[in-house]
């Protein structure tokens, strides 16, 4: 089976920028991922792309099989993941078209399975141990630096750091919820950043979020109610720039064998009880 070293999880239009694309269906112990993986070459690197919501956006945020998605990527050889996503801005200065590379995350989801290490037997009879993963810094520091440099190189000055609060969805926040998020000092709000980030960490993957602001959330000073139509419009206007940044980030990520960041040491000293792919 073909392998990749870098994974991109994003909207279904992104795989169109890969060269020599092949579509691969992957089975996992956690069921099927959101869709097939699209393997190809980008910037001289072997990349696996996975449409987070499936083709045609058929899977809502709270129904995404995040465990299967990350497991499938790792089973294909992926060790570094870029996760572009659409978010709402919680500050007036983070208007539509802002690119923010967060360094912190707050989980406000309710029903999502967020660990591989729950002590529940897998289909092959193996049983993962209960593991408490270090997650103080949820994003790869190396990947963040690469993403920031890639954006600046394309003339798109990104916001360096900030907190993404992740809500359950699929509805948008009420005004009261959004005002509370803003009052807490959080930067942007999204629906898919968790448990994607922590599951990547549990698998020893370097994960970098690249958050494109598509609207001012209702709790921002000048924010109105969010509409899905407006989110799609703004994302469509900026997807070309985001592809360019992704291209450069993929080119500049370190070689897999040279990784030595906190992500690679997440389970030092732990007996996982299962073998990772």
Question: What are the language-model segments listed below?
Answer:
Residues 267-277:
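Acidic, Ser/Thr-rich low-complexity intrinsically disordered segments
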């Amino acid at each position: 089976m073909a392998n990749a070293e870098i994974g991109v999880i994003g909207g279904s239009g992104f795989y169109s920028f890969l060269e020599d694309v092949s579509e691969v269906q992957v089975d996992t112990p956690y069921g099927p991922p959101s869709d097939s993986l699209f393997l190809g070459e980008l910037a001289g690197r072997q990349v696996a792309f996975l449409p987070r919501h499936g083709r045609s956006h058929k899977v809502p945020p709270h129904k995404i099989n995040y465990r299967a998605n990350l497991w499938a990527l790792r089973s294909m050889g992926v060790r570094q993941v870029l996760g572009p996503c659409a978010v709402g801005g919680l500050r007036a200065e983070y208007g539509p078209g802002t690119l923010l590379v967060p360094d912190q995350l707050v989980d406000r989801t309710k029903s999502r399975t967020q660990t591989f290490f729950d002590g529940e037997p897998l289909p092959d009879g193996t049983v993962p141990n209960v593991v408490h993963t270090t997650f103080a810094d949820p994003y790869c520091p190396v990947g963040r630096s690469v993403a920031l440099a890639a954006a600046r190189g394309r003339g798109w000055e990104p916001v360096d750091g900030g907190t993404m609060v992740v809500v359950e969805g699929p509805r948008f926040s009420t005004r009261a919820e959004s005002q509370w998020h803003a009052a807490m000092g959080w930067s942007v709000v999204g629906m898919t950043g968790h448990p994607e980030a922590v599951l990547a960490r549990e698998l020893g993957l370097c994960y970098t979020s690249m958050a494109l602001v598509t609207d001012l959330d209702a709790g921002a000073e000048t924010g109105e109610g969010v509409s899905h139509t407006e989110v799609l419009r703004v994302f469509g206007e900026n997807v070309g720039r985001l592809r360019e940044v992704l291209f450069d980030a993929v080119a500049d990520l370190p070689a897999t064998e040279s990784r030595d960041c906190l992500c690679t040491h997440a389970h030092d000293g732990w007996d996982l009880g299962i073998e990772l792919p």
